[in-house]
């Protein structure tokens, strides 16, 4: 970052399967942190050339609609929405997200087969968050466009038997042929 908080001017876009698929300059996707990942954070991430994500943990459709509208006033760049299935209060959320014109969705905390078909048939790009190889294989079989492989160091709901991202990531990458975003335990 520069002293003014902006991105360095000499930073060049990084072309990967993920950045090409998502239409962003950098293959970085902001985590859909519950109660935090709203339009202000997501727009800052998207405006910096990565992909901002709006979380839907409240389950309140009016609040989600308001955040999506705010996002569109704060950024003209690509962004996505996360559907955390554990918190879904209205089963029409997939249709709602489609109606809002969202183009990218991550699904998490649930079965990848629940919304993938509906979202993809509407032309959306869908990634599913997976904590295990079995979950990754199930998500790929469900037809997701990519995976967010999240080890035990990541936020959210964890199992005490979770493995580290640096163990899980190569295990999954060797067995699937979809773009992968690594999450949890990524530090410098």
What are these regions (language model features)?
Residues 184-188:
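A short glycine-centered flexible hinge/capping loop motif at secondary-structure junctions
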């Amino acid at each position: 970052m520069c002293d003014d908080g902006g991105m360095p001017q000499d930073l060049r876009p990084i072309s990967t399967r993920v950045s090409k698929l998502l239409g962003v300059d950098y293959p970085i996707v902001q985590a859909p942190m519950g109660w935090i990942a709203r339009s202000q954070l997501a727009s800052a991430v998207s405006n910096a050339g990565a992909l901002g994500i709006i979380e839907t943990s409240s389950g309140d459709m009016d609040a989600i609609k308001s955040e999506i509208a705010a996002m569109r006033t704060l950024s003209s760049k690509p962004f996505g929405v996360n559907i955390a299935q554990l918190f879904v209060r209205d089963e029409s959320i997939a249709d709602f997200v489609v109606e809002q014109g969202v183009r990218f969705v991550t699904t998490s905390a649930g079965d990848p087969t629940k919304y993938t078909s509906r979202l993809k048939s509407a032309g959306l790009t869908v990634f599913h968050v997976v904590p295990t190889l079995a979950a990754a294989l199930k998500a790929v079989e469900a037809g997701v466009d990519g995976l967010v492989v999240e080890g035990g160091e990541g936020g959210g709901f964890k199992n005490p038997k979770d493995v580290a991202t640096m163990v899980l990531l190569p295990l999954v990458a060797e067995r699937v042929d979809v773009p992968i975003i690594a999450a949890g335990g990524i530090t410098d």
